């Protein structure tokens, strides 16, 4: 363990206790107000690994995330279970083919003014998916240059043409590309499932906080064990039928409109 990773783990451990206390109080508030509902697993899933390219999984790059000694083995477990049932597996990587910010036709908008996009040229080693979780034959690697995997890509086309109802999302980062992909997925009618041991980020506490918030509002955060058990219990993918409608949820009564005193 390096000094840097040791410091990260120490801060993460100390933050965990504080965050758990905050989450316990927050969960009561959310439950009382009708949040934190479960969207549940559907019948016809796909897996998408968000930005598990070398820039995020290997040391030495500005985008590197710690915790890969946990993340990579859990991603491998999900791949093994998904492939055994013929479940589609997709990957994304952020790449930039026109990085000239002054050209007026760059493919990153103003993102270059916030993050070091110049360190991630297309076709570089850093933009390639980590060999430990390399795509199998026929699995698609989607190039993107936005946070979410949906805008400007064919992901939604791939999912709808395969009649996908559930999207299992892994990768990095929790606060950025994973979160935005999950938010877009639920808005487009897919059931987002996030295996908690497969999510990374660069700063202590960020993964824990974002998974808590995602679980309250945008998707179901589950253990990798639960996701693998779900995949293991599925029939072969070609024998599944999508579950398109959400399960009934308890309704919360809307508060009455506020009554304002007549102004004189």
UniProtKB/Swiss-Prot annotation:
Binds 1 sulfate ion per subunit. Its cofactor is sulfate. Gene3D superfamilies: Isochorismatase-like (3.40.50.850). Residues 240-264 are annotated as: Disordered. Signal peptide: none annotated. The active site is at residue 177. GO terms for molecular function: N-carbamoylsarcosine amidase activity. Its EC number is 3.5.1.59. It catalyses: N-carbamoylsarcosine + H2O + 2 H(+) = sarcosine + NH4(+) + CO2. CDD domains: CSHase. It is an enzyme of class 3 (hydrolase). Keywords: Hydrolase. Pfam families: Isochorismatase. The keyword Nuclease does not apply. It comes from the Bacteria. SUPFAM superfamilies: Isochorismatase-like hydrolases. Transmembrane segments: none annotated. One of its GO terms (biological process) is creatinine catabolic process. Homotetramer. This is N-carbamoylsarcosine amidase.
